[in-house]
Amino acid sequence: MTAYAIAHLRNPQLNADVVDYIDRIQATMDPFGGRFIVHGGEVDVREGEWPGTIVIIEFPDAAAAAEWYDSPEYQEILPLRTNHIDSVALIVKGVPADYDPRATAAAYRALLPS
């Protein structure tokens, strides 16, 4: 099942290291089937506060996303970003194409006290 590596980059500032990171990241993703879904840009905040921007990278599955993140190639370039940008990174699993939130709501409803 598809998975996503998501990073919230708070107040990113461009510098030579960050540009080098951007230039090199695709080569680290290719062996794991990663592709950018969202790569920064303006965020249209509708609820709450959201300082910064977001990056979303799609992978074939959670194992591929984790293997990419933990790979020596990615770990080598990671400090180029993390030394300059305050961020949070995570991996989440997607839902199947036929996902119906009503089934989830029904399961949760069954857990509620009567």
For the regions a protein language model found, what residue spans apply to each?
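A contiguous, mid-protein "functional segment" used to position or interact
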Residues: 63-98
